[in-house]
Amino acid sequence: MEPIPNDLILEIFSRLPAKSVIGFRTLSKHWASILRSPVFTELFLTRSSNRPRLLFAAERNGEWLFFSSPQPQNRYEKSSHLDYHTKFSGDVSRFICSYVSGLLCFPDLWLSKDASPVICNPTTGMYESLPDLMRYKNARGFLGFDPIGKQFKVLSEAYPFSDQREHHEILTLGTEELSWRSNIISCPAYDRSLSEGICINGVLYYLAQTLGVPSCVIICFDVRSEEFKYFDAGCFNDQLDDTSGLILVNYEGKLSGINWKYGQAGERRTVELRMWVLEDAEKHEWVKYVYTLPENEVLDSCDFSVAGVTTRGDIVLCMKYTCKPFYVFYFNPERNTLQSVEIQDFGANLEAVENCGRVYAFVNHVEDLRVNKGKQLKSSISQVKHLCSCCNKVSQPDYHYQKA
C-alpha cells in the first residue's frame, strides 16, 4: 500500500480542530514531526484565519469557561451555535486577560495558593504558568506578537510598586527556560496604564496617563525590537476619571479607540458610539466619528460592552452577563446597519440573577499552534461527562487526547 503523501496529510489535518491535532501529535514521533513542523503550523493558522470566530470567556464564582462561535458570514444570519472548549478554576486579582492570536494572558491568576501570570490557549486547553514577579505584584501585563520572528512576548509594566517606572519586564514564550528580563530600552515614564493592550502588525499599544498634569498618551512597544515610543492622545482626556468603557481596537489596520454612552430620543433610550481613529500615524492625527445605533429593543435595554472590530469592519457589542437569550450585535458604520445574532445555548442554566457570570468577548479568534509547550487543563482530558455550566447540553471530552 502506498504511503500517504505528506502534502495530503498536511491538507487533511489543517482542516481539523486544534485539540484533535494536538492529540494526533502523541501517536508517534513521525506524526509529531509532521504536525509540529513550521509548514503545517502556518498552514493551520491560515485555514483558521479564514474562518474567524468570536471567543467568549465567562467568569462565574472563580470559574472560567471558554466558548466560541462563528462570526457571521452574511448580513442575514440571526443565530449562531456555541462550541464549548474548556474550563478551569482561578480568580483574577486585579486585571483581566489580554488576547493575541488565539492566546490569552492573565497577569495575575490564582490557580493555586499564589497568583502568577498564566498564558492559556482556550481552544486546546493548553496553558503555561509564568515565573512570578514579586516586585511587580498586581501590575498589568500585556501580550504581543512579532509576525516576523514568529514570537509571542509578555510585557509586564513596572507600575505601581517600582521607583523606576520606566523599567518594565519582558518574557519570550517558546524558549527552553521561561524567564523575565528587564528591557534595555527604557519605557517613557507614566503614572498608570488606563486600558488593555492591542497588538497591530507587531506593535503593542496601550493608553496611559502622564506624570504631573494628567493627560492621555499612547505607549507603543515594538515587540520585535523591544523599543518604546509614545505619542499624545489628548482626545481621550475627558475620560481620565473613568476609562472602563474605553477599548483600543484594530479598525481596518488602524489604531482606534471606542467608547459608548446612552442618549435619549423622546421616550426611547439610544446608544451612541464614539470612535477615534488614528488616521495619520506619523503626525498622530486622530479623527472622531460619532454614531447613533439603529433602534434595537434588546440592545437599548441591556448591559453590554464593546468587544472589538471584525476584519469586515463590524463593531461588535456583546452582552456583559450570561443570560437567556444571549445576543451579540454587529454594527457596520459604513452601512449604518445593526445585526443581532442570538448565541444559542449560552446562559441557559444561569437565568437566576445570583448565578449570572461576567462575559468577556474577543473578536477574530483563531486557532494557533505556534506555542506548543504547556500543560493540558484537566477538564479538557477528563473521561467523565461534565455538564457545561452555561448551557443545557452535556459536553463530551476529547477521547483522541488522554495524555496528562
From Swiss-Prot:
Pfam families registered for this protein in UniProt: F-box, FBA_3
Sequence ranges assigned to domain F-box in this UniProt record: 1-47
Q: Which Gene3D superfamilies match?
A: 1.20.1280.50
Q: What is this protein called?
A: F-box protein At3g57590
* Top-level taxon of the source organism: Eukaryota
Q: Which SUPFAM superfamilies match?
A: F-box domain (SSF81383)
Tell me the organism.
Answer: Arabidopsis thaliana (Mouse-ear cress)
